[in-house]
Structure formats: structure tokens, C-alpha cells
């Protein structure tokens, strides 16, 4: 019997799992292609055939993790309240994700690319998901008018800042308060 599984997909999962393990064990800056290859039980050329350098591996890992959180937090229906609840839940998951937080805190040069210079794949995935939910909320009447992608991009900026900077304001806003205030900010921004 011939297997219908994609062996490349299995190898990529092993590589990304190994990259995550290395980041947790050694930190972002000390994670190497050699150690990822060793942990994934593949050769370095196998990794290099898929990604040109360590930054690309980490970027792919972040994309997989962030898209995975979006899948873990189910759509809660149409309307502004459901949209805001889902965004806040996704943000909370990402604030608690060890890999995401390790990159933000320990690889500022890499993080700054996606904070200040350009949209990453995972950010575009989030904007597209937001735009879809915003469009549904507009049709339902609970979200203000405007281009759904523009509104989604602004929601991403608001939410991304809480993921990146929550630790900085933890003296004033604990995790529950961050969720409450993020919810208010998004709800107010999206209200008709």
C-alpha cells in the first residue's frame, strides 16, 4: 500500500519542533541550524533546502504557532462582541506562548522586522481573519463602516502592542486587566 502522507510535511514539522525546543533550551540567539538538524534527525542541507537561514526557520515557526492559535480559538459567531472576544483570547494565548515571547524579548532585531518594518505572513493571516469577521459584523450592523482590511490592520496594531508590551505595564495592568482594557479599546474602535 502506498502512503498518502507527505513526507516533506513530516520533515518540516520535525524541523520546526526541533527549532522550538532549541529556542526554549538555548534562547533565540544561541539556536543554530546544526542543533536544529541534530534534534530533528536531519542533515543541515535538508533544512537549507527549505529555509535559507535561521531567521527564516524562526519566522516560519512563528507563523505556524500564531496561525495555530487562531485555529485553537474558534470563531465565536458574527458581530462585534464575538469578534472582540476572539481577538482578546488570541492575544492572551500569544502573551503566554513561550516561543513568541522568547523572540520578542530575546531577539529584538528579528522582532523589530515584524513590529516596525513589514508585515509577516502570520500578521497578514490575522488581518485577513479580522477583515472577514469585521465584514460579517458590518453586515450584521454591529461594526462601523469602513474598509474591513483597514479596520483589521488597526485592530492588529492595537492588539499586537498588548502582546509585545504587557510585561512592561504589568505593575499597572495584570493579565485580566489587560484583557478587559484591550476588549474596551477594540469594542470602542469597532462600534458604529
Where are these regions (language model features)?
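Basic, helix-initiating cap at the start of DNA-binding domains
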Residues: 1-26, 30-39, 55-59, 64
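Amphipathic alpha-helical packing segments from all-alpha helical-bundle domains
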Residues: 102, 113-140, 149-153, 180
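Hydrophobic alpha-helical segments that form the core
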Residues: 89-93, 134, 144-166, 175-189
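Short hydrophobic/aromatic patch on the recognition helix
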Residues: 40-51
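Helical hydrophobic small-molecule/effector-binding pocket
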Residues: 84-106, 120-124, 128-131, 156, ...
